[in-house]
Amino acid sequence: MKQFANLHLHSTHSDGVYTPEELVRIAKNEGYRALALTDHDTVSGNDEIRAVCEREGLDYIFGCEFSSPWRERRTNFHIVGFDFDPEYPEMKEYLAQRSFCEAEQTRILFERGLAEGLLHDITWDEVLDYNRGVTWLCNNHVFNTMKAKGLVADLDYMNFFHTVYGKRRGEVKPPYESKPIDKMLRLIRDAGGFAVVAHPHNKLDVIPELIGMGLSGLEVWHHLLTPEERLKALELAKVNNLFISGGSDHDGLCGGYYSSFEHPEESEFYVPECSCGTQEFFFREIKTRTLHSEREAVIEGCIDLEQNANY
């Protein structure tokens, strides 16, 4: 099913491959007509992508992806917050904390890598300088700086990641904790936004509980959901009046991870063009924050299309 809007994207402002401007160009060429940049715990790229979308004639909605634990269930959720005010005091403070945590963890492991001889011929100041304007600094930003200096090539990434970062990230305790799921949902709402659960492929059974905490929607067309899970998600959205979202995340052309493959369909990151995202009808609901009376019939039509495609 060809999608209209791609509402789950990552840029170089978090752990994505492309700049916001590059993302718009690639998404437009692929066929998308509306976008949301949902970088991890940061909104530093949103002004840029909004401006480029306006210039290129694409629709846009403000977004960010947060990670929240649900300790009682011993699991973690990714929550996309849409259309909130990043200047709302508590949200502004939380975004600053999350960026500081990521950058500080990255810096500490970077310094350990230097001390242990795992890294060389690079300084933290060079990482900061190369990634100006980025506040949420992760291992990708270190690697990209090294690549720009000619110290590594793309094929070196996995060895770099597992040697310098990888499981070692657990050795560095963050100075601030992520907000648990109930408090994260409340903060997004208090900041004037609404929340959608990202790629709920193995968490659909707890959606009713999350609705009670303030969840407003869920992703349906995301590569991690099986055909059966997409059908279940559509039914949940219909019965519970939930917004329907979706996006390519780190996969597909916008993910950037199979651009070097001669045959992209051989990559684990491959998805058919414009297959992840959401339909124009559901995007308009999200954009206007209004559920339309004909949505049940539209959802039933999507269910029929999904069933016919799968059987």
Task: Enumerate the language-model features and the residues they cover.
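An N-terminally biased module of ancient metal coordination in phosphate/nucleic-acid-related enzymes
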Residues: 1-74, 164-167, 173-189, 194-197, ...
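Generic signature of intrinsically disordered, low-complexity segments enriched in small/polar residues
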Residues: 21, 26, 35, 97, ...
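Generic detector of intrinsically disordered, low-complexity, polar/charged segments
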Residues: 13, 60, 78, 147, ...
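His/Asp/Glu-enriched, well-ordered alpha-helical/loop segment
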Residues: 256-311
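Extended substrate/RNA-proximal surfaces in nucleic-acid metabolism proteins
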Residues: 54-208, 287, 301-309
